[in-house]
Amino acid sequence: MAVVEILDISLTETVSARLRGRYLRAVPGTLNTAHTMEITGWVLGRECSAVAVELVNKCNVCLRAPVNIHSPDAAAIYPGVTEAAYSGFSLNISVLGLTPEIEFLVQAVLKDQNRVLIGVIRARRLWRLRSA
């Protein structure tokens, strides 16, 4: 059975000139069956709203998802920020065709179309024998 193991997640600094906050829910050590990875979280722009999140591998945007999912945890952390309530995103990507060792840059796309790095996710594809 093919699995994808998340090896490491490195997040950028929370406070920046363009991002108010971000969170990734991919957990190191997580094994995903088949050839897919699911990455969820939330992101808040500071002066310009985050409208999408992209996964980039070797300078190519592999997947883009809108920032529009209900995120009560972000709303609780930033109660005075209106867009915090719907600052969530979900990315489900197939890693077929990528090298066995995978690295994704996770970047926010702001309303003005600037990109801001959220973090880096390293993973690997491997085969696991089924238990008897």
Locate the predicted segments by residue.
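Basic, ligand-binding patches in group-transfer machinery
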Residues: 1-132
